């Protein structure tokens, strides 16, 4: 039986996804706690309309809006940017190390000098060092944007539910729904960004080492899109603007887990 290919860091993708999931679950927990403390009094158990709830304050709408502003501030404090950046940095260092180990294996296979191909972007190689910094900033921004979208959408959901007479159950469903949507977004980020980072690190190392061509390799499972199944095993030039998937290297198309094998 042929040995299963291991050119894509699936475990690192899943680790990245799990870490983002943990962040999102913290957001969900914070949301539920805030709702119980600051907004619970404005809703009923779901059997009465809004004007039956305990909100005798004639300025209840303004009070809710003020509470939702406070919600934004509270959520911003759930994790600071350094926490997110630290997570992203750990992920990217791991992807880089995976790429580095692959490069060393190719070095042994073809007999090239290890120093030529085994470049570490965190150890003084200017081009890769700059790429690393940019990728960390990009992914930190992606997670922060995902968080802000989660907060903004929940504020709208909660206000509309209260305004339309929704009960606790309705708001609980809204929180769960938004959390589920955000978890799926995290899955997309982990998959897409892992493939892109690996692709670009591998391509730079390979071309720096003198390789001009690569073989497109897929994961050879049921998730591989038909187009990439057809590309699997075919040879392309790194500098061909129409090669690969319309000029994109393996791993660069959205949600692509394919990888390049330099030859």
Where are these regions (language model features)?
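Acidic, glycine-rich two-metal-ion catalytic cores of nucleic acid-processing enzymes
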Residues: 177-181, 185-263
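N-terminal leader/targeting and assembly helices and adjacent pre-domain segments
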Residues: 1-181
């Amino acid at each position: 039986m042929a040995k299963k290919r291991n050119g894509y860091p699936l475990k690192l993708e899943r680790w990245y996804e799990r870490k983002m999931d943990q962040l999102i679950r913290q957001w969900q927990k914070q949301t539920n706690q805030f709702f119980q403390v600051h907004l619970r009094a404005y809703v009923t158990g779901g059997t009465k309309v809004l004007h039956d709830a305990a909100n005798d304050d004639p300025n209840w709408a303004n009070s809710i809006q003020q509470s939702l502003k406070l919600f934004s501030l509270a959520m911003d404090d759930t994790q600071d940017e350094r926490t997110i950046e630290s997570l992203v940095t750990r992920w990217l260092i791991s992807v880089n190390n995976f790429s580095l180990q692959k490069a060393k294996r190719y070095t042994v296979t073809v007999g090239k000098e290890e120093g030529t191909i085994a470049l570490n972007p965190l150890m003084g190689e200017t081009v890769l060092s700059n790429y690393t910094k940019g990728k960390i900033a990009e992914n930190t921004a992606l997670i922060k944007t995902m968080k802000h979208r989660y907060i903004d959408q929940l504020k709208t959901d909660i206000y509309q539910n209260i305004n339309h007479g929704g009960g606790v159950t309705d708001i609980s469903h809204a929180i769960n729904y938004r959390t589920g949507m955000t978890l799926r977004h995290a899955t997309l980020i982990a998959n897409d960004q892992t493939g892109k980072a690996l692709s670009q690190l591998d391509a730079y190392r390979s071309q720096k080492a003198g390789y001009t061509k690569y073989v497109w390799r897929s994961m050879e499972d049921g998730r591989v899109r038909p187009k990439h199944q057809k590309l699997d095993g075919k040879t392309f030039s790194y500098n061909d603007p129409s090669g690969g998937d319309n000029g994109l290297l393996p791993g660069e198309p959205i949600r692509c887990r394919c990888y390049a094998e330099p030859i």
